[in-house]
Amino acid sequence: MVNYPHNLIRQKVSSVQKQTKQNKVDFANRGMSFEAAINATNDYYLSRQIAVIHKKPTPVQIVKVDYPKRSRAKIVEAYFRQASTTDYCGVYKGHYVDFEAKETRQKTAMPMKNFHLHQIEHMACVLHQKGICFVLLHFSTLKETYYLPAQALISFYQIDNGSKSMPIDYIRKNGFKVAFGAFPQVPYLNIIEQNFLGGDYN
């Protein structure tokens, strides 16, 4: 585990949030993982020229490779070249979009150990440059997904440096429920369109 210096200060969330209606369609019932559903959603947006959003590659340094068979190589040792920031980034209607996706089986909270300081700092930098930054939080047991603006995540993290889990009530109050769909499966751009581009979220 890598420790990073902390230089963020506490902030207070003072925003008005809305929730969208929930649809009963669930990608998990179709055998898809949360990440696969997001990737399929991004493919849908790309194929219809709605947005260009991709999963960021993780830079890895391969150290050792075994060859159990001549036609097959097995990586047995590798290291991350640098700390990752967020999972996805791209552009939508001229706006830079950057977000992280997390999943938990817990019913009452999202573990903050899933978030690292360098990710929080990266999100703060994106917001400083007026980018659209958020996290998609999926509660697999509840079959509920939420769009939480990055500022709400940052503010909660700064209370105790991310040592406590984030209650689902906080997420529901400060975020937006994402209505599952067939195409796309996780229509998070609807949240952006309705509440950030021409909406009343500040």
Curated annotation (Swiss-Prot):
**Record GO terms (molecular function):** endonuclease activity; magnesium ion binding; nucleic acid binding
Give the cofactor note text: Binds 1 Mg(2+) ion per subunit.
Spell out the subcellular localization from the entry: Cytoplasm
Going by the entry's taxonomy, the superkingdom of the source organism is recorded as: Bacteria
A GO CC annotation given for this chain: cytoplasm
Chain sites annotated for binding Mg(2+) = T85, D87, E100, Q119
Which InterPro entries does this one have? Answer: Resolv_RecU, Restrct_endonuc-II-like, tRNA_endonuc-like_dom_sf
Q: What class of enzyme is it?
A: hydrolase
What Enzyme Commission number(s) does the record list for this chain? 3.1.21.10
**Site: Transition state stabilizer. Where?**
K102
> What's the chief localization of this chain?
cytoplasm
Q: Name one GO biological process term.
A: DNA repair
Please write the reaction equations for the catalytic activity of this protein: Endonucleolytic cleavage at a junction such as a reciprocal single-stranded crossover between two homologous DNA duplexes (Holliday junction)
Q: Which UniProt keywords apply?
A: Cytoplasm, DNA damage, DNA recombination, DNA repair, Endonuclease, Hydrolase, Magnesium, Metal-binding, Nuclease
Write one Pfam family the protein is assigned to: RecU
Cofactor(s) listed in the protein's UniProt record: Mg(2+)
Protein purpose: Endonuclease that resolves Holliday junction intermediates in genetic recombination. Cleaves mobile four-strand junctions by introducing symmetrical nicks in paired strands. Promotes annealing of linear ssDNA with homologous dsDNA. Required for DNA repair, homologous recombination and chromosome segregation.
The record's similarity note reads: Belongs to the RecU family.
User: HAMAP family this protein is in?
Assistant: RecU
What's the protein called, per UniProt?
Answer: Holliday junction resolvase RecU
Q: Which organism is it from?
A: Streptococcus pyogenes serotype M49 (strain NZ131)
Q: Which gene encodes it?
A: recU
